[in-house]
Amino acid sequence: MAKIISFDEESRRALERGVNALADAVKITLGPKGRNVLLEKKYGTPQIVNDGITVAKEIELEDPLENTGARLIQEVAAKTKDVAGDGTTTATVLVQALIKEGLKNVAAGSNPVSLKRGIDKTTEALVAEIAKVAKPVEGSAIAQVATVSAGNDEEVGAMIAQAVEKVTKDGVITVEESKSLTTELDVVEGMQIDRGYISPYFITNNERQTVELENVRILITDKKISSIQELVPVLEKVARLGQPLLIIAEDVEGDALATLVVNKARGVLSVAAIKAPGFGERRKALLQDIAILTDGQLISEEIGLSLDTASLEALGTAQKITIEKDNTTIVAGNTTKPEIQKRIAQIRRQLEETDSEYDSEKLQERIAKLAGGIAVIKVGAATETELKDRKLRIEDALNATKAAVAEGIVPGGGKTLIYLASKVDEIKKNFDEEEKIGADIVKRALEAPLRQIADNAGVEGSVIVSRVKDSDFNTGYNAATGEFEDLIAAGIIDPAKVVRSALQNAASIAGLVLTTEAIVVEKPEKKAAAPADAGMGGMGGMGGMGGMGGMGGMGGMGMF
């Protein structure tokens, strides 16, 4: 495949054009008065969204050089989403401003490497400053964080706060689509473990790349399973019941895994397998936790139990199991409450006796997984388009809430970034001259999110930035009402983790763009043009379709 190579200023300008094309489409969604973006779908109805990451993912540019720039911004947005769960639009606006200011200075003769060093050192100092000013989140602040992130939807804010209260901050909260018109909160007992499917061939939902099983039997063992013969008795019993089966084992490999995959593909048995979580003694304890939660038994040779003699009573049960690439959620229902409480009490006693910080952390994690349960927010709406938009907003709000609980909160609405800009002059005192220019690039870029929030609200961004600069730490611009007020009191707050991640990821990619001297991309293939004079001939009649032979009987199940 032939390549296009671009150098120097030409390469950086191509990247900037790509960055601007994507960022301009994303940044109009920022703030309480952010506009919507309509996305055409190849199949189905167009989607109307107000979510930065969703817009960013949809954009692909025709020019391969510019598209490289766009993809860098997609990475900023995706990384921010992965780490903090929200703040993707803020990160996009920041990186666009950093690149714009930085490239001006590179074109004027500044050393890109020194600029990058200045940007990196300034960002590092500002991240420490965010940690200093962040306040712990408690009480009504949880609902306020969720409300702001959900586009000022107070119903969603209250629902997420309620979910956090019910399952504790250590519990698991998921968002699902509902068939009704209303959005509801449903709390069920459950556990999330950090192990995904052993083989992608177990996947049942191709769109989400997940395994989803309902009314499941669970085989829990600390053994490594390599021979299918060990599993045959259990598989036969479960196949007769017609229920899906989840196998949790040290590992499933060789012909055991191959046979399970083949029978799943043929539709003979709905089955999936995951590796047991943890290691050593902790693994056994976690498997015992899962057994108690699912009302099953840990099959271990240490207690005289083997796979080939396991009865159906030894298998755990779960209402629903969702297995992703890296984690598994088990919803067991409310069947074993007293046993769960006994187990939690036992772990708490261990927690009181341990002196090890590591052991203490792991024991608390186990209590959270047993006690926390799972809250499910079922999103309802009148149309599919509204449903998808509402679901995205709720997922953003949920992620923002988790981030707030993790690292605390700061004033929102771009105010914290303006405050950070005021600290840059102090930070850069010991920098060399070109590093100081890098620090100033960060200082100017930090104003961009507030400027954009104001522009989206239909007011002059420069005027708003100037007034907010002159106010105290908590006072900023409320774009929803057009007032300058105490943002914390008004409930306009951001999770510190979101602000930190947006700044770090934006600075990282901006530094890479500024120090880029060449781009190598694949040359697009030219599509063969149709012959100019070739009128389309009449379509020949379709021949009769031959009779379809009788379908052979389905073979017996391979493992029996």
Swiss-Prot record:
This is Chaperonin GroEL 2. It comes from Trichormus variabilis (strain ATCC 29413 / PCC 7937) (Anabaena variabilis). The lineage of its organism: Bacteria, Bacillati, Cyanobacteriota, Cyanophyceae, Nostocales. It catalyses: ATP + H2O + a folded polypeptide = ADP + phosphate + an unfolded polypeptide. It holds the Pfam family Cpn60_TCP1. GO terms for molecular function: ATP binding; ATP-dependent protein folding chaperone; isomerase activity; unfolded protein binding. The keyword Amino-acid biosynthesis does not apply. Keywords: ATP-binding, Chaperone, Cytoplasm, Isomerase, Nucleotide-binding. Belongs to the chaperonin (HSP60) family. One of its GO terms (cellular component) is cytoplasm. Forms a cylinder of 14 subunits composed of two heptameric rings stacked back-to-back. Interacts with the co-chaperonin GroES.
